[in-house]
Regions:
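Short polybasic amphipathic segments
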Residues: 10-12, 69, 160-164
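Acidic-basic catalytic patches of nuclease active cores, encompassing PD-(D/E)XK
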Residues: 16-61
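Terminal alpha-helical anchor/extension segments at protein ends
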Residues: 44-50, 63-66, 70-72, 90-91, ...
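Short His-Asn-centered micro-motif
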Residues: 58-60, 72, 82-85, 105-108
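Conserved catalytic cores of phosphodiester-cleaving nucleases, focusing on short active-site segments
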Residues: 69-71, 76-95
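Feature captures the catalytic cores and cofactor-binding loops of soluble hydro-lyases/lyases
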Residues: 87-144
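Non-catalytic C-terminal interaction segments of nucleic acid-processing enzymes
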Residues: 128-181
Length: 181
């Protein structure tokens, strides 16, 4: 018997002081049966960090040809490709060839650092790639905010991201491992 995705709803007020972006988004996230709350909330964090009217969640773990989020223009050109985890170098290179900007959000603490030590040198010359690491204490704290129906506020200022519900606020400071040139 196949397990179905669990649907989560998030009403998210996003205030990005760095980009002067203020908007409310009603989001629907389908959590794949193998996806953890931590990973799902990191998808939500990535959305908040790059929010726009054209940024969308994809089939994610259910598809090998799509990232976790992407932003396309009206012609279907991929402007932004956002991936979570530790993708293979071949997949990253393919994404960089298809999209104007590729952003990788690493997490999982020490395993992410080991992945970057093994993969980073091979990616150093890719000009449209940004690699960010989310410290494990931040991603685990974000996971605690996961509920089937969420009312969240996201504030971004000076590269720091605060995600809050009515009771708890989590500050996330992404570590920049590689920045788009």
């Amino acid at each position: 018997m196949a397990f179905k995705a669990t649907i989560f709803k998030a009403d998210c007020q996003i205030i990005d002081m760095d980009r002067h972006y203020h908007h409310d988004h009603s989001l629907t996230l389908a959590r794949h049966p193998s996806e953890t709350d931590e990973r799902m909330m990191l998808r939500l964090l990535a959305f908040a960090h790059h929010a726009s009217d054209t940024l969308t969640f994809t089939r994610g773990l259910s598809s090998s040809d799509e990232p976790d989020l992407w932003q396309k223009d009206l012609t279907g050109t991929i402007e932004r490709w956002i991936e979570l985890g530790q993708p293979e170098e071949k997949r990253i290179r393919k994404a960089c060839g298809r999209a104007q900007q590729v952003i990788i959000y690493c997490y999982s603490g020490n395993s992410a650092r080991i992945w970057w030590e093994q993969t980073g040198a091979g990616l150093a010359n890719i000009k449209n790639l940004t690699v960010l690491n989310i410290p494990s204490e931040n991603s685990k704290a974000l996971a605690q905010l996961a509920q089937r129906n969420m009312q969240l506020q996201a504030t971004i200022q000076d590269g720091d991201i605060w995600i809050a519900d009515n009771e708890t606020s989590v500050e996330v400071t992404p570590e920049t491992w590689q920045l788009q040139q």
